[in-house]
Amino acid sequence: DDDDDDHTIEHFETF
């Protein structure tokens, strides 16, 4: 779940 729009790049592994 990408609830961190600000850290889309930082949390790339979240995808």
Curated annotation (Swiss-Prot):
It is found in: Secreted. The keyword Secreted applies. It comes from the Eukaryota. GO terms for cellular component: extracellular region. Keywords: Secreted. This is Unknown protein 2. It comes from Ichthyophis tricolor (Three-colored caecilian). The lineage of its organism: Eukaryota, Metazoa, Chordata, Craniata, Vertebrata.
